[in-house]
């Protein structure tokens, strides 16, 4: 059913209907109340559900109120009520010992940091109480982890001491005596000979390193992945004795870090 126009009261058909200010209007009836200028949805202004143009839109004016005794009494009463409420709120929060603080991002960050610190301290105290006061069990977790890793890396070193076999060849380069040359009656002093460590020959068993290894003691040798170890002798199931061909160093090496060639 088609509605009636809010101004002329006639039926408004969909082709000329304007729905605005909770009413239905003809396009021609939708005009300013003062100057009768036709309006649309973009330039109208509503006041008390009536359309106005921008020039004739009613402006609100404020009226002055005289300071009569009655108005002064109401003003004083409202001030007293506000003071009473303020004192009530103050008395309620007086015994609580805190003041209301705005929840700013900086305070949230500080609160989060304090929570993390308290959690860390709680876990530290818990670990200390769980480990007990004994020397072995009261050890810090970092020291325990380092000792566990070292004992895992060298399980056989704690059981059997290192013994360098007497049959292991020791390579020494013979030192050449400097020869002095003489020219007539003058004798030229001999130049010093620099002694260099030479890599041993390729005799005996040969192995290839499959991992990098850094020497933990003075009687061990360091090597890299792919290095060749020559003159290898088996000491036990976990350790060998040989010479790194690249560096010429001789000493102990773990058997599970190399493979036979």
From Swiss-Prot:
Residues 5-56 form the LIM zinc-binding domain. The modification Phosphoserine is found at residues 99, 118, 134, 146. Nebulin repeats lie at residues 61-95, 97-131. GO terms for biological process: monoatomic ion transport. The modification Phosphothreonine is found at residues 68, 104. SUPFAM superfamilies: Glucocorticoid receptor-like (DNA-binding domain) (SSF57716), SH3-domain (SSF50044). Gene3D superfamilies: Cysteine Rich Protein (2.10.110.10), SH3 Domains (2.30.30.40). The keyword Phosphoprotein applies. InterPro entries: Lasp1_SH3, LIM-SH3_domain_protein, Nebulin_repeat, SH3-like_dom_sf, SH3_domain, Znf_LIM. It comes from the Eukaryota. Residues 202-261 form the SH3 domain. PANTHER family: LASP, LIM AND SH3 DOMAIN PROTEIN 1. Interacts with F-actin. Interacts with ANKRD54. Interacts with KBTBD10. This is LIM and SH3 domain protein 1. It comes from Pongo abelii. The gene is LASP1.
